[in-house]
């Protein structure tokens, strides 16, 4: 089935009959990706058939997902998506998920009936064949349980053969953007199903970008290790702690341990520690997610960081390490330029004193003067600018500030503040044109705005009479 045709058919299938949500090609791709993580090869292409999808559903249903993070709602969603995909490939036209499940139940019922009839015929002909087959299955299961993750050679001895390339790539892609989050923990639970303790440690240490998350996981694992040692004193029959954490043993010895419970216990410790770290990052703003704002005082940033560290479930050594490094790494650029030369081991009092004046006008001007001195520029700019309005007014006012009145021509004030008002009509000081009482330069009893005759826009009093130079024209 072609991809475009598959997308059209998926958009017609409802997730539930009561809702208007429909399946998309993204749902199918997610289910296939999770199936591939479980070790089952599943490819969605144009040549995929309904029989292949039915085999994949059967293999996924046979997996033991008790200790896997893919269980509950995610497991049901994967199965339902694959069954809808199978029903479309089989030629059915389901309206919703329930209809597709009904088609699948009918198909499996027919398969069981046909298989039962065939097994009945085989038992009647070869009665001892079934018993031999069951014995072989039990023997193979025991061999696989004892040899995983080691490989059994031809002479029957187990041999450790590490192959972490696929797991390392998956883990690197899962932690590339957000580090150890909830999605990465689910991926970690899937890819560490058959790994020994040394391989799990190598997997965690393969992400140097998120070293802080890995250190938190290791600290929580050490807490569980100490708790198990204390518990072992009262329960001497428990497995050895060194066997659980793989201490003092080679990878081959870890792989050939008789007790598979040790590997599984260490794996559960790592998953629980990673889940606690991921939940702490997403539930409340933890110390890893606290950053200093561009204009936030350094003391306020340290107070928020210390409050977050106090609420974190971690040893005091881990909290002290985080406080020393995060107080520098998560500060803003201005504070980092001062704290980097001091180093993370500097006492907190010196850090606070160094960043006390960061962001103020004085510190900015000091940085400016220092930069200008390094460039060899001599400037009369003072090191500290005035901070009060009075001081600012005293420096920016006065005749030497360059301001000149275009009315009287004097410096020290502007035209709107000039006290020597001048009338534009008569040219005399002391009043404005709207209050002028003169008429053509002569005194008038009526105000300027109430005269009967309109006035010109220029001074007529200053104009003289003009005599024409040409002789007059005489008409006969």
Curated annotation (Swiss-Prot):
GO function term, MF aspect, one: nucleic acid binding
InterPro entries: Gag_p24_C, Primate_lentivir_Gag_pol-like, Retrov_capsid_C, Retrov_capsid_N, Znf_CCHC, Znf_CCHC_sf
Lineage of source species: Viruses, Riboviria, Pararnavirae, Artverviricota, Revtraviricetes
Annotated motif PTAP/PSAP motif, positions: 468-471
Assigned keywords, A-Z: Capsid protein, Cytoplasmic inwards viral transport, Host-virus interaction, Metal-binding, Microtubular inwards viral transport, Repeat, Viral budding, Viral budding via the host ESCRT complexes, Viral matrix protein, Viral nucleoprotein, Viral release from host cell, Virion, Virion maturation, Virus entry into host cell, Zinc, Zinc-finger
Protein's name according to its UniProt entry: Gag polyprotein
Note in the entry: The sequence shown is that of isolate R29-127.
UniProt-reported outcome of changing residue 117 to E: In strain: Isolate R29-106
Span of zinc fingers (CCHC-type): 403-420, 421-438
Keyword Cytoplasm set for record: no
Region (Disordered): 130-159, 437-476
Organism (species): Bovine immunodeficiency virus (strain R29) (BIV)
Cystine pairings recorded for this chain: none
Site-annotated residues for Cleavage: 126-127, 148-149, 367-368, 392-393
Role of this protein: Matrix protein p16 forms the outer shell of the core of the virus, lining the inner surface of the viral membrane. Capsid protein p26 forms the conical core of the virus that encapsulates the genomic RNA-nucleocapsid complex. Interaction between incoming particle-associated Gag proteins and host dynein allows intracellular microtubule-dependent virus transport toward the perinuclear region, prior to nucleus translocation and integration into host genome.
Top-level taxon: Viruses
Keyword hit for Metal-binding: yes
Pfam families: Gag_p24_C (PF19317), zf-CCHC (PF00098)
UniProt subunit comment: Interacts with host light chain cytoplasmic dynein DYNLL1; this interaction is critical for intracellular microtubule-dependent viral genome transport.
Family: Belongs to the bovine lentivirus group gag polyprotein family.
Biased composition (Polar residues): 450-468
UniProt biased composition (Low complexity): 130-147
């Amino acid at each position: 089935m072609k991809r475009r045709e598959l997308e059209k058919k998926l958009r017609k299938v409802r997730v539930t009959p009561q809702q208007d949500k429909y399946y998309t090609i993204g749902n199918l791709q997610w289910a296939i990706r999770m199936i591939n993580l479980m070790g089952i090869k599943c490819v969605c292409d144009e040549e995929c058939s309904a029989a292949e999808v039915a085999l994949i559903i059967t293999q996924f249903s046979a997996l033991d997902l008790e200790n896997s993070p893919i269980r509950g709602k995610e497991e049901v969603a994967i199965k339902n998506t694959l069954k809808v995909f199978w029903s479309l490939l089989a030629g059915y036209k389901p309206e919703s998920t329930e209809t597709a499940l009904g088609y699948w139940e009918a198909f499996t019922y027919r398969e069981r009936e046909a298989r039962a009839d065939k097994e009945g015929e085989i038992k009647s002909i070869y009665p001892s064949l079934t018993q031999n087959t069951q014995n072989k299955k039990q023997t193979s299961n025991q061999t696989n349980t004892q040899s995983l993750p080691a490989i059994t050679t031809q002479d029957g001895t187990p041999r450790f053969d590490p192959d972490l390339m696929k797991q390392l790539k998956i883990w690197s892609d899962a932690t590339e953007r957000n580090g150890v989050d909830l999605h990465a923990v689910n991926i970690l639970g899937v890819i560490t199903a058959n790994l020994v303790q040394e391989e799990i440690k190598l997997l965690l240490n393969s992400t140097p970008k998120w070293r802080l998350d890995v250190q938190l996981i290791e600290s929580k694992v050490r807490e569980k290790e100490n708790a198990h040692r204390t518990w072992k004193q009262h329960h001497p029959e428990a497995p050895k702690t060194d066997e659980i954490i793989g201490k003092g043993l080679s990878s081959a010895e870890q792989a050939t341990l008789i007790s598979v419970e040790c590997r599984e216990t260490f794996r559960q410790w790592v998953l629980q520690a990673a889940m606690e770290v991921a939940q702490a990052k997403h539930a409340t703003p933890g110390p890893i997610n606290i950053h200093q704002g561009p204009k936030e005082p350094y003391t306020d940033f340290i107070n928020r960081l210390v409050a977050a560290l106090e609420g974190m479930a971690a040893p005091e050594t881990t909290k002290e390490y985080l406080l020393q490094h995060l107080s520098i790494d998560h500060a803003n650029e201005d504070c980092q330029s001062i704290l980097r030369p001091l180093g993370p081991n500097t006492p907190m009092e010196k850090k606070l004193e160094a960043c006390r004046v960061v962001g103020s006008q004085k510190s900015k001007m000091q940085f400016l003067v220092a930069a200008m001195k390094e460039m060899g520029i001599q400037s009369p700019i003072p090191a500290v600018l005035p901070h009060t309005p009075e001081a600012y007014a005293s420096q920016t006012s006065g005749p030497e500030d360059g301001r000149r009145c275009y009315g009287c021509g004097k410096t020290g004030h502007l035209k709107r503040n000039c006290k020597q008002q001048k009338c534009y009509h008569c040219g005399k000081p002391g009043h404005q044109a709207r209050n002028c009482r003169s008429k053509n330069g002569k005194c008038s009893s009526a105000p300027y705005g109430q005269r009967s005759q309109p006035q010109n826009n220029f001074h007529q009093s200053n104009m003289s009479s003009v005599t024409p130079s040409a002789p007059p024209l005489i008409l006969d």
